[in-house]
From Swiss-Prot:
Reaction catalysis annotation: uridine(55) in tRNA = pseudouridine(55) in tRNA
Isomerase listed as a keyword: yes
Cross-referenced Gene3D superfamilies: Pseudouridine synthase (3.30.2350.10), PUA domain (2.30.130.10)
Alphabetical GO biological process terms: mRNA pseudouridine synthesis; tRNA pseudouridine synthesis
Gene (UniProt): truB
Protein name: tRNA pseudouridine synthase B
Enzyme class: isomerase
Residues the entry annotates as binding substrate: H43, Y76, Y179, L200
GO molecular function, one term: RNA binding
């Protein structure tokens, strides 16, 4: 006789995972989902197996707002090998060229300055970007090259931490859709020596503090020590789901207007932002219940609402 299945939970919140080296983002997601016994879970932008660092995992109703974290700014620490270019632009690929490195700090800083600010970037063939429903890396592994359009990106800050004639270490604060491996590959070509990513760590997503990250091993230890039938210690690590949209202006509504929004109706509001997405709360308790949009001054329309108000 088989073991009885353990029912999942309707648990809402966001856990900031410190992704370990060598594990795919989806593998980590499934492990976390099982640990929390969550009915629904989703991550907010994959990290390569080579990469480590912050991977927000949304549970339950928080998955409705994961796109806003996918669209958020990111901060990375990267170590690049100079003098060697690979077909994947990272250490997991095949070496395609080896060249001598002739470099001084003035020339390096001048090359780095090229990447600061607004620019356009052609995504790597070894990225998870989809083409006809399939990630580009699937085509690349079959030797197929797909034409990709350059996309606008913004590097808000790029700091040189240390360098020598074999490697360079950078910290990069950038917009969504920025491929660090492409920056490193382009940097290597600009320097004339080639380069690839040796190590990559995501330090931040949006404004989430690095101090709130937790490792998979820590979650597993907490779950192993937890009393039977309670996950309170794990749940205490969850951030509220509205933290995903904390940068949006807040609109607090009385219960009657909140009820109308839940029915899909547009409501009139005063003394609110003129336009754009807003974070919605209800009543004196300020319970979060989703996001809306002010498409015209004084008119609020529902966009993504949770199933019911959560405390």
């Amino acid at each position: 006789m088989g073991r009885p299945s353990r029912r999942g939970r309707d648990i809402d919140g966001i856990v900031l995972l410190d992704k370990p080296l060598g594990l795919s983002s989806n593998d980590l997601l499934q492990k976390v989902k099982r640990l929390f016994r969550a009915n629904k879970a989703g991550h907010t932008g994959a990290l390569d197996p080579l990469a480590t660092g912050m991977l927000p995992v949304c549970l339950g109703e928080a998955t409705k707002f994961s796109q806003h974290l996918l669209d958020a700014d990111k901060r990375y620490r990267v170590i690049a090998r100079l003098g060697e270019r690979t077909d994947t632009s990272d250490a997991e690929g095949q070496t395609v060229s080896v060249r001598p490195v002739s470099l001084d700090k003035t020339r390096l800083e001048a090359a780095l300055d090229h990447f600061r600010g607004e620019s356009s970037q052609v995504p790597s063939m070894f990225s998870a970007l989809k083409h006809q429903g399939r990630p580009l890396y699937e085509y690349a592994r079959k030797g197929i090259t797909v034409e990709r359009e350059a996309r606008p990106i913004h590097v808000y800050d790029l700091q040189l931490h240390r360098w020598d004639l074999t490697k360079v270490e950078l910290e990069i604060h950038c917009s969504k859709g920025t491929y660090i491996r492409t920056i490193i590959d382009d940097l290597g070509e600009r320097l004339g020596c080639g380069a690839h990513v040796m190590a990559l760590r995501r330090l931040a997503v949006a404004r989430y503090p690095i101090e709130r990250m937790v490792t998979l091993a820590a979650l597993q230890a907490i779950a192993a020590d937890a009393p039977p039938d309670t996950l309170a210690q794990l749940d205490a690590l969850l951030l509220p789901m509205d933290s995903a949209v904390a940068d949006m202006p807040l609109v607090n509504l009385p219960s009657d207007l909140a009820a109308r929004l839940r029915l899909g109706q547009t409501v009139a509001v005063t003394a609110q932002p003129q336009a754009g997405l807003v974070r919605l709360t209800e009543g004196d308790a300020g319970r979060f219940f989703g996001i809306g949009e002010i498409a015209a001054p004084g008119r609020l329309t529902p966009r993504r609402l949770i199933a019911e108000p959560r405390a």
